[in-house]
From Swiss-Prot:
Enzyme Commission (EC) number: 7.6.2.11
Subunit description: The complex is composed of two ATP-binding proteins (PotA), two transmembrane proteins (PotB and PotC) and a solute-binding protein (PotD).
Gene: potA
ABC transporter domain sequence ranges: 11-241
UniProt catalytic activity: ATP + H2O + polyamine-[polyamine-binding protein]Side 1 = ADP + phosphate + polyamineSide 2 + [polyamine-binding protein]Side 1
NCBIfam families assigned to the protein according to its UniProt record, in alphabetical order: potA (TIGR01187), PRK09452.1 (NF006987)
Organism: Haemophilus influenzae (strain ATCC 51907 / DSM 11121 / KW20 / Rd)
One term under GO cellular component: ATP-binding cassette (ABC) transporter complex
Enzyme class, spelled out: translocase
This protein's name: Spermidine/putrescine import ATP-binding protein PotA
Protein purpose: Part of the ABC transporter complex PotABCD involved in spermidine/putrescine import. Responsible for energy coupling to the transport system.
CDD domains per record: ABC_PotA_N (cd03300)
Pfam families per the UniProt record, alphabetical: ABC_tran, TOBE_2
InterPro entries for this protein: AAA+_ATPase, ABC_SmlMolc_Importer, ABC_transporter-like_ATP-bd, ABC_transporter-like_CS, Mo/tungstate-bd_C_term_dom, P-loop_NTPase, PotA-like, PotA_ATP-bd
Length: 372
């Protein structure tokens, strides 16, 4: 029964359109979100992600299309009557009220009986581990504590969906990392559908069950963090999520259903793809920095790898990042290796001649024509 509830759609956006004047932000936009999911709507500035959130919250009106919440059409339902709450970037806490009164505010607006308010507020504060702060003012709390109070206020009236609008961006790095974990744990505890809007791909990967990546008002890819990172649908997705190296390739022949022999930046090698290809077709081979293998070479040593030289290196604690410039065309690639201080071949020096290969099958192969 629980799995059936989790697989049940809680939000459906059907063919929605929104314009501001002559500028169409989203058009014929469709999205289904299931009950209990933590979904992140991700994308660069101007992609339409905040517009989608505001439409869900009822803060903007649709030009056309419909919004369905738990089977009910709420397209024309005002914001205050939707079972959807929003945590904004600013948290919007009332500075003159105590924490208790901040959390109780929504219940009082809904005319909840006084005898119900105290236990519900304390329960919400207990969920975010701030019950002992009930009598303090927001200015007496840290940024992370204010974040949790804003969430407590948003969940106290038991919404079906919680929207979070870039609500971690004001925190410092360490606190932001901590809150990412706390938010995910809280979402699991509450069982409420969370829809998180951000431009930060690291946040999206860390917290989400599912990422919806937008580009110019369209869905560029919809999938799990792992699917989007390891199997990007196109070059935009690959470049937006993490670092990526893009190699030019030319098909020589298909060897099997999964394997193509190709010339990749001058290296004749197998690449793994089941897409239809023809001889001399141009492809792009995408490799994450951690997928690439560096082999140190003497200046006159022969190798079947792609040859280049180290032009920069950055120690990052657990990893060593090296920038390699290819000899044949000056292209630069980023390589990330787990740092091992006992390995004499790990700490590459500037100017070192190297050969570049990769773990077979870890590459992503895209059709050159599809990656504009």
């Amino acid at each position: 029964m629980e799995n059936q509830l989790q697989n049940k759609p809680i939000i459906e956006l059907r063919s929605i359109k929104k314009s501001y004047g002559s500028n169409t932000i989203i058009n014929d936009f469709n999205l289904t979100i299931n009950n209990g999911e933590f979904v992140t709507i991700l994308g660069p500035s101007g992609c339409g992600k905040t517009t989608v959130l505001r439409l869900l919250a009822g803060l903007e009106e649709l030009d056309s299309g419909s919004i369905i919440l738990d089977g009910e059409d709420i397209t024309n339902v005002p914001a205050e009557k939707r079972h959807i709450n929003t945590v904004f970037q600013s948290y919007a806490l009332f500075p003159h009220m105590t924490i208790f009164e901040n959390v109780a505010f929504g219940l009082r607006m809904q005319k909840v009986p006084n005898e119900e308010i105290k236990p519900r507020v304390l329960e919400a504060l207990r969920m975010v581990q701030l019950e002992e702060m009930a009598d303090r003012k927001p200015t007496q709390l840290s940024g992370g504590q204010q974040q949790r109070i804003a969430i407590a206020r948003a969940v106290v009236n038991k919404p079906k969906v919680l929207l979070l609008d870039e609500s971690l961006s004001a925190l410092d790095y360490k606190l932001r990392k901590q809150m990412q974990q706390e938010l995910k744990m809280l979402q699991r505890q509450l069982g409420i559908t969370f829809i998180f809007v951000t431009h930060d791909q690291e946040e999206a990967i860390t917290m989400s069950d599912r990422i919806v990546l937008l580009r110019k008002g369209k869905i560029a890819q919809d999938g799990s963090p792992r699917e989007i990172y390891e199997d990007p649908a196109n070059l935009f997705v690959a470049r937006f999520i993490g670092e990526i190296n893009v190699f030019e390739a030319t098909v020589i022949e298909r060897k099997s259903e999964q394997v193509v022999l190709a010339n990749v930046e001058g290296r004749i090698c197998d690449i793994y793809t089941d897409m239809p290809v023809e001889k001399d077709q141009k492809l792009q081979v995408l490799l994450r920095p951690e997928d690439i293998v560096i082999e140190e070479l003497d200046e006159n040593e022969h190798s079947k790898a792609i040859i280049g030289h180290i032009i920069d290196r950055t120690y990052k604690g657990m990893t060593l990042e090296s920038t390699v410039e290819f000899d044949h065309n000056g292209m630069r690639v980023l390589v990330s290796e787990f740092f091992n201080e006992d390995d004499p071949h790990m700490d590459h020096s500037i100017g070192q001649r190297v050969g570049i290969t990769w773990h077979e099958g870890w590459e992503v192969v895209l059709n050159d024509e599809d990656n504009q």
